[in-house]
């Protein structure tokens, strides 16, 4: 009871009226109010100021804000306020430290850290930096795979653009050329058949073919007519012995048969007699025609080098210049007896390959060409080297019919191209 009375006296100053005691109590109440303002945070509201400090310094600042203990009488109410203030400060510090650890890059709670004063252990490691090395290694592997894919040259489908062309027969074209390769051996002759001829030789054959190239150009005939003409001559001479004075007649009749088979408008017999300087009569021409078709057993239609040339030029995506150059090289080969050892498909492939090397100045043979020709680059080098040699000598000597033909504007002066001499150097 005595303690409660003292409490009521200290807390209720209105019980005292004036005097020294009342002044002392009033001064004590003002002093307690000042102390409460210094210790209790819940007093006067302050403006929100955001300072950039390190997390370690922030804890020090919070500790410094706690005022030194004041020696004063403590009531129950004041003690409860001090205890609650310490508890709230401790909980706030714990929450801020946990928040800084969990989300160091978050801006929702306005925690700003100065990089200059930030300790090394407080710096978060970005995820991008942690995965830098694996990402680089994976990208390098991807680049290596992509480079390998680039190096692997794909085989192009050359028949898709002609799918809607009924004359191209794109759906049967592979079967057709597969058949041509099987039967092309029937159009080949023995490379030494001239040995059984007693009155003619290789040189005479070359003169005849060179003259027929000029006649072919004079009548403006198609390419396939010339190739079939030379094939008929060789196949006939392999089976039949011919005297020297009848050799030109064999050439005229072979061209007549080829024109009947390939051309829309066939030259008349009188024109052929006239171009031969009337060396033969009409009767002799018709008689030799009967002899030739019987010797060949009427087997006129055979795959020549021209048949394969059209396909291989398409595989090479040849333009007009490359096409003319390839035909120039293969017509030079028609004159040479030594080229009979090569099959028609190999001659055509070698002509396309040599023409590409001549145009580009380097060896050029794509996977598409190799696929459609069935010949690798190594398989064509021997034939190609001979063609380059013929090209170098085309403008010299007496047999220059093909060179003069391809030196005109009609054939874009193709014969004036520099030969691919580097193919001969590689052979050496």
From Swiss-Prot:
Cell inner membrane is among the record's keywords: no
Record-level GO BP terms: cell division; mitotic cell cycle phase transition
Entries under InterPro entries matching the protein: Cyclin (IPR039361), Cyclin-like_dom (IPR013763), Cyclin-like_sf (IPR036915), Cyclin_A/B-like (IPR046965), Cyclin_C-dom (IPR004367), Cyclin_N (IPR006671), Cyclins_cyclin-box (IPR048258)
UniProt-recorded Gene Ontology molecular function terms: cyclin-dependent protein serine/threonine kinase regulator activity
Keywords, ordered alphabetically: Cell cycle, Cell division, Cyclin, Mitosis
PROSITE patterns named among the record's database cross-references: CYCLINS (PS00292)
Recorded superkingdom: Eukaryota
Cell division as UniProt keyword: yes
Span list, region Disordered: 1-22
SUPFAM superfamilies to which the protein is assigned, alphabetical: Cyclin-like (SSF47954)
Subunit architecture: Interacts with the CDC2 protein kinase to form a serine/threonine kinase holoenzyme complex also known as maturation promoting factor (MPF). The cyclin subunit imparts substrate specificity to the complex.
Its biological purpose: Essential for the control of the cell cycle at the G2/M (mitosis) transition.
Family: Belongs to the cyclin family. Cyclin AB subfamily.
Descriptive protein name: G2/mitotic-specific cyclin-1
The organism of origin for this protein: Medicago sativa subsp. varia
Highest classification ranks of the organism: Eukaryota, Viridiplantae, Streptophyta, Embryophyta, Tracheophyta
């Amino acid at each position: 009871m005595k303690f409660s009375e003292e409490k009521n006296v200290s807390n209720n100053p209105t019980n005292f009226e004036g005097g020294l005691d009342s002044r002392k109590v009033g001064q004590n109440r003002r002093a307690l109010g000042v102390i409460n303002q210094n210790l209790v945070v819940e007093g006067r509201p302050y403006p929100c100021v955001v300072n950039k400090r390190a997390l370690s310094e922030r804890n020090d600042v919070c500790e410094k804000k706690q005022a030194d203990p004041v020696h004063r009488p403590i009531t129950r109410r004041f003690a409860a306020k001090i205890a609650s203030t310490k508890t709230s400060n401790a909980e706030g510090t714990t929450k801020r430290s946990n928040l800084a650890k969990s989300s160091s890059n978050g801006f929702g709670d306005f925690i700003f850290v100065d990089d200059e004063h930030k300790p090394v252990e407080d710096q978060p490691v970005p995820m991008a930096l942690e995965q830098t090395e694996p990402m680089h290694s994976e990208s390098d592997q991807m680049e290596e795979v992509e480079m390998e894919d680039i190096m692997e040259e794909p085989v192009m489908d050359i028949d898709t653009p002609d799918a809607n062309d009924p004359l191209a027969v794109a759906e049967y074209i592979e079967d057709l050329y597969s058949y041509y390769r099987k039967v092309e051996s029937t159009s080949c002759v023995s490379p030494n058949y001239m040995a059984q001829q007693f009155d003619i030789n290789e040189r005479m054959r070359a003169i005849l073919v060179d003259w027929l190239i000029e006649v072919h150009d004079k009548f403006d005939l198609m390419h396939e007519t010339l190739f079939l003409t030379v094939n008929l001559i060789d196949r006939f001479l392999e089976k039949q012995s011919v005297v020297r004075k009848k050799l030109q007649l064999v050439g005229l009749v072979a061209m007549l048969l080829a024109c009947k088979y390939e051309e829309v408008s066939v030259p008349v017999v009188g024109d052929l007699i006239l171009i031969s300087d009337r060396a033969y009569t009409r009767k002799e021409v018709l008689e030799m025609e009967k002899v030739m078709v019987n010797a060949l057993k009427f087997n006129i239609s055979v795959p020549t080098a021209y048949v394969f040339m059209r396909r291989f030029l398409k595989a090479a995506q040849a333009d007009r210049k490359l096409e003319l150059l390839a035909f120039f090289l293969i017509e030079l080969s028609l004159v040479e007896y030594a080229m009979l050892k090569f099959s028609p498909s190999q001659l055509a492939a070698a002509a396309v390959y040599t023409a590409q090397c001549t145009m580009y100045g380097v060896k050029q043979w794509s996977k598409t060409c190799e696929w459609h020709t069935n010949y690798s680059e190594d398989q064509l080098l021997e034939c190609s080297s001979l063609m380059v040699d013929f090209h170098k000598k085309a403008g010299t000597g007496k047999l220059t019919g093909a060179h003069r033909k391809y030196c005109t504007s009609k054939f874009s002066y193709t014969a004036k191209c520099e030969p691919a001499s580097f193919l001969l150097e590689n052979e050496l």
